[in-house]
Amino acid sequence: MPTINQLIRKERKKVVKKTKSPALVECPQRRGVCTRVYTTTPKKPNSALRKVAKVRLTSKFEVISYIPGEGHNLQEHSIVLVRGGRVKDLPGVKYHIVRGALDTAGVNKRTVSRSKYGTKKAKATDKKATDNKKK
């Protein structure tokens, strides 16, 4: 425990919190342009073809971001909205693309967790048709 005189001579060190998404520069989301859209394979125990995109953000950072959901309409030069959030089994992927914003379409025929995938609510007639199929 330091004395008062020691604290006057040299103050306590501030703990600097390191951000997990530095490319967003203190913003919740950033706009960017896709420079490359491709698939990649996850780390060891998992096996899949994960859809990712290399995005040039307005903050001048070039980041790799994950495209969530089934199917997408992204290609080179698409304007996308990027949020933070890593993908545990993809090394170097620390960002997610927001579905249903800017050039990114929402996921088709999605009924649960729609807000996460940018899908509009189904019409009442469509809902009745899907209910009849379940029975």
UniProtKB/Swiss-Prot annotation:
According to the UniProt entry, which residues carry 3-methylthioaspartic acid? D89
**PROSITE patterns referenced in this protein's UniProt entry, alphabetically:** RIBOSOMAL_S12
Q: Where is the composition biased (Basic and acidic residues)?
A: 123-135
Keyword annotations for this protein, in alphabetical order, are: Antibiotic resistance, Methylation, Ribonucleoprotein, Ribosomal protein, RNA-binding, rRNA-binding, tRNA-binding
Q: Name one GO molecular function term.
A: rRNA binding
A single GO BP? response to antibiotic
Please name the Pfam families in this protein's record: Ribosom_S12_S23
Q: Which InterPro entries match?
A: NA-bd_OB-fold (IPR012340), Ribosomal_uS12 (IPR006032), Ribosomal_uS12_bac (IPR005679)
GO annotations of cellular component type: ribosome; small ribosomal subunit
Q: Does the keyword RNA-binding apply?
A: yes
Spell out the Basic residues composition-biased ranges. 111-122
Disordered: annotated span: 108-135
User: Which family does the similarity line name?
Assistant: Belongs to the universal ribosomal protein uS12 family.
Please give the subunit comment from the record.
Part of the 30S ribosomal subunit. Contacts proteins S8 and S17. May interact with IF1 in the 30S initiation complex.
Per the entry, what this protein does is: With S4 and S5 plays an important role in translational accuracy. Interacts with and stabilizes bases of the 16S rRNA that are involved in tRNA selection in the A site and with the mRNA backbone. Located at the interface of the 30S and 50S subunits, it traverses the body of the 30S subunit contacting proteins on the other side and probably holding the rRNA structure together. The combined cluster of proteins S8, S12 and S17 appears to hold together the shoulder and platform of the 30S subunit.
Q: What is the protein name stated in its UniProt record?
A: Small ribosomal subunit protein uS12
